[in-house]
Design a protein with these regions (language model features):
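Glycine-rich, aromatic-lined ligand/substrate-binding cores of catalytic
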Residues: 81-84, 100-117, 122-123, 137-142, ...
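Beta-sheet entry/capping signal
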Residues: 27-33, 108-112, 128-133, 157
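Helix-loop-helix "hinge/cap" segment bordering the ligand-binding cleft or interdomain interface
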Residues: 1-39, 55-103, 158-169, 173-200, ...
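Conserved small-residue motifs centered on glycine
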Residues: 176, 181-302, 307, 344
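Secretory-pathway/luminal and periplasmic proteins that interact with or process carbohydrate-rich
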Residues: 17-27, 38-45, 51-54, 109-114, ...
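Active-site-adjacent "gating/activation" loops or surface patches in catalytic cores
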Residues: 56-61, 75, 126-153
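Ligand-binding clamshell of periplasmic/extracellular solute-binding protein-like
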Residues: 3-10, 32-49, 111-121
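Histidine-centered catalytic/metal-binding microenvironments
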Residues: 299-350
Length: 350
């Protein structure tokens, strides 16, 4: 069964390493793999340690910087254990996405990240329904499953320059991106490419999209692989799951919807609302954020690979002192103030 606790997850990784699941007679399996360091894997693993996001997050009404918490230390310890026991890909901090994919296509990976599993495994879409989605893990640090989710509103970035002769029209256009129908257009493109209407007025996949929907969508959907401003809240509108092949819904879409309903939706929590900092707060924190991101990325790799001993209290204290010296208090103070304003605004609306 899919593991639901941190201990069960560890046991599964050991089985991937030792039991030759690909059946080739060689111990060539990599239990847990990723690319670009822990950037993508991390978001699935830190919730097991009571962390919603490895950055600024809200916990019990207070804003904190998660990498400076004791929860982060437990995460580092666990990942170091996986690395030392070769349960974590030894190339996780150096390999590209294509290198990870090559391992997946060779049937060597047990657990990995990707938008869809077949992007890494190389399987056909219909075959990928046998690859289950990761289930949020409980542990001694997290009693209930926890799945970080977005607010449903994607602010992204947009700019209107002084050369724009029609800023009002541009604002109307940007505002329109938050309309569910427009959001759907941005996600799956205009009629006739990914989808078309059947005789009953219901959307169905075009013949071209039935072969490889993502290949077709990548050519016509404006927000494919991009962070666009827009409305994400209603998955029925945004993701277009009513698309069918004839009278049948795409089996893979059905699979993804069910996996999400079972494993993500019941446990979803937003790490931190979309906050707006004042210009003064931005000026104070901008450099701090950049410095901390670089520092944490480097220290995370050192702790996990054992270059620094995460079990050494003196090493840990030095790590915390470095974070504090970069302006942690200023950063938390600014985000706490912005969070308090967000709470107050909500109370006024209600």
């Amino acid at each position: 069964e899919v593991p639901k606790t941190l201990d069960e997850f560890y046991d599964l990784l050991v089985r991937f390493r030792d039991d030759d699941p690909n059946g080739n007679g060689e111990q060539d399996e990599i239990p847990l793999s990723g690319s670009d360091g822990m950037t993508y894997l991390r978001q699935y693993l830190v919730p097991s340690f009571g962390i919603k996001k490895f950055d600024m997050e809200e916990k019990d009404g207070e804003v904190r910087y998660a990498p400076a918490s004791e929860d982060a230390r437990e995460y580092y310890k666990f990942m170091n254990k996986l690395y030392e026991e070769k349960l974590l890909d030894q190339e996780v901090f150096s390999q590209s996405g294509d290198q990870k994919k090559a391992k997946g296509e060779s049937d060597r990976l047990g657990v990995y990240h990707d938008w869809f599993s077949y992007f890494t495994s190389g399987k056909e879409e219909e075959e990928a329904v046998t690859d289950p989605m990761f289930h949020p893990l409980t542990s001694e640090w997290q009693a209930e499953p926890l799945a970080p989710i977005k607010t449903g509103i994607n602010r992204s970035t947009a700019a209107i320059t002084t050369a724009n002769e029609h800023p009002e029209a541009t604002m109307r256009w940007l505002d329109g991106l938050y309309d569910p129908e427009i959001a759907n257009l941005m996600s799956v493109g205009p009629e006739g490419h990914v989808w078309e209407l059947d005789d009953n007025g219901k959307r169905q996949y075009t013949e071209a999209a039935q072969g490889d929907v993502e290949e077709v969508r990548s050519k016509v959907a404006p927000n494919y692989g991009l962070e666009f401003p827009g409305y994400h809240q209603d998955k029925e509108d945004y993701d277009g799951p009513d698309l069918t092949i004839g009278d049948e819904e795409n089996p893979f879409i059905t699979f993804v919807k069910q996996e999400t309903a079972d494993k993500i939706d019941p446990y979803g929590e937003v790490p931190l609302p979309d906050l707006y900092l004042s210009q003064e707060e931005i000026d104070k924190t901008q450099a701090i954020i950049g410095d901390l991101e670089t520092f944490i990325e480097q220290e995370e790799a050192k702790f996990i690979t054992g270059q620094k001993d995460i079990n050494d209290d003196a090493v840990w204290e030095q790590y915390l002192q470095e974070i504090e010296s970069m302006g942690l208090d200023t950063l938390v103070e600014a985000y706490q103030a912005a969070y308090n304003r967000w709470v107050e605004a909500g109370e006024q609306i209600n």
